[in-house]
């Protein structure tokens, strides 16, 4: 898929912007604090309806304004598709093909993107919550069912946790109602667990091939999905649900004592294993970066496999974090295949040599200027 056009209105430091992008590699050059990352963030928001940098939507609205608008036209295999996200002080609204959508979950998946930024190294060396967020954001683009189930699970988890807190402090004592809430949570949780197992395995297949190539055949990478539910390729949703129900039953008293759910997909993780060792704990910084790069490139191939179309790739000041060798592997892998947006203070070295016919924009104080070839 291709993002052909992007329009911004009162978004961060952009008062008004209308730009047409090239289908290949688009390079956004500018000094810090000029708006490069804001532009990539707007593309990300057009895909996910939210920022990857802040949970406070008010920060996205321009100074002294009440409404920010991000809209664009996506060229998909099925044709042109207009998308729009409106952010106001009172909430958020989205449009697909000029029609408002009742639920945000029906919007995600119309524009697929893979973001690679310096902070994405936390995917490998950070806390498990980073990897759960990664699964939900990336797998949610590929499967509307997965996104819907994760949304349902989080809502029901919050409800159960609130009820467990009331139990802890003696404000509730209805075990039958707790059982009903728990049964509902287990039903959707089992579906989430099985979907994650299947998708992590497929992602791992692509990541292993890429990592083997990037490491020059010196290292072997595997991804292990870690869950309290014992799942493998043959586990059905019904079996996972039954396991969760049993685990909740066995741990009910302990959960009441803690006032929160101790069992479920909200405790899941992914382990990255390089040559038999957990790279999160024992890997060098170079191994962690190679792993992060392999996983990000694997996302692209998995999305193509799942949806039939390549996603957009957003590279936010990430080239400066990679050595020449890793830059070469990254740029070679995406060349002439994926519409890419690169932010940088300058295009030099390996990147300038490897990028074929880039479309270059300079950004200064929220103003975008296309360089003539």
Curated annotation (Swiss-Prot):
The keyword DNA damage applies. One of its GO terms (molecular function) is single-stranded DNA binding. It holds the Pfam family SMC_N. One of its GO terms (cellular component) is cytoplasm. Its main location: cytoplasm. It is found in: Cytoplasm. Gene3D superfamilies: P-loop containing nucleotide triphosphate hydrolases, RecF/RecN/SMC, N-terminal domain. Keywords: ATP-binding, Cytoplasm, DNA damage, DNA repair, DNA replication, DNA-binding, Nucleotide-binding, SOS response. ATP binds at residues 30-37. The keyword ATP-binding applies. Disulfide bonds: none annotated. One of its GO terms (biological process) is DNA replication. The RecF protein is involved in DNA metabolism; it is required for DNA replication and normal SOS inducibility. RecF binds preferentially to single-stranded, linear DNA. It also seems to bind ATP. Belongs to the RecF family. This is DNA replication and repair protein RecF. It comes from Limosilactobacillus fermentum (strain NBRC 3956 / LMG 18251).
């Amino acid at each position: 898929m291709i993002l052909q056009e992007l329009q911004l209105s009162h978004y961060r430091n952009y008062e008004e912007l209308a730009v047409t992008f090239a289908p290949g590699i688009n390079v956004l050059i500018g000094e810090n604090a000029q708006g490069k990352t804001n532009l990539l963030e707007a593309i990300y928001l057009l895909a996910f309806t939210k920022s990857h940098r802040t949970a406070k939507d008010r920060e996205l609205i321009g100074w002294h304004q009440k409404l920010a608008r991000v809209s664009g036209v996506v060229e998909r295999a099925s044709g042109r598709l207009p998308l729009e996200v409106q952010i106001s002080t009172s909430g958020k609204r989205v449009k697909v093909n000029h029609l408002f959508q009742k639920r945000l979950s029906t919007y995600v998946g119309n524009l697929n993107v893979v973001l690679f930024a310096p902070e994405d190294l936390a995917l490998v060396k950070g806390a498990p919550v980073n990897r759960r967020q990664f699964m939900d954001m990336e797998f949610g683009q590929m499967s509307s069912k997965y996104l819907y189930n994760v949304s349902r699970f989080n809502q029901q988890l919050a409800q159960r946790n609130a009820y467990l807190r009331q139990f802890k402090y003696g404000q509730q004592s209805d075990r039958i109602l707790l059982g009903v809430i728990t049964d509902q949570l287990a039903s959707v949780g089992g579906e989430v667990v099985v979907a994650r197992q299947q998708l992590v395995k497929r992602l791992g297949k692509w990541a292993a091939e890429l990592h083997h190539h990037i490491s020059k055949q010196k290292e072997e990478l595997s991804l292990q999905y870690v869950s309290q539910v014992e799942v493998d390729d043959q586990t059905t949703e019904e079996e996972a649900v039954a396991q969760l129900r049993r685990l909740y039953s066995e741990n009910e008293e302990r959960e009441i004592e803690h006032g929160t759910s101790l069992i479920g997909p909200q405790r899941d993780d992914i382990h990255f294993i390089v040559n038999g060792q957990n790279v999160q704990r024992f890997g060098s910084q170079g191994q962690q970066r190679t792993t992060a790069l392999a996983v990000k490139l694997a996302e692209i191939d998995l999305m193509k496999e799942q949806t039939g179309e390549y996603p957009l790739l957003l590279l936010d000041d990430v080239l400066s974090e990679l050595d020449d060798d890793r830059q070469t592997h990254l740029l070679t892998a995406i060349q002439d295949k994926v519409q890419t947006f690169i932010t940088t203070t300058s295009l030099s070295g390996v990147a300038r040599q490897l990028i074929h016919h880039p479309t270059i924009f300079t950004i200064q104080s929220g103003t975008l200027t296309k360089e003539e070839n």
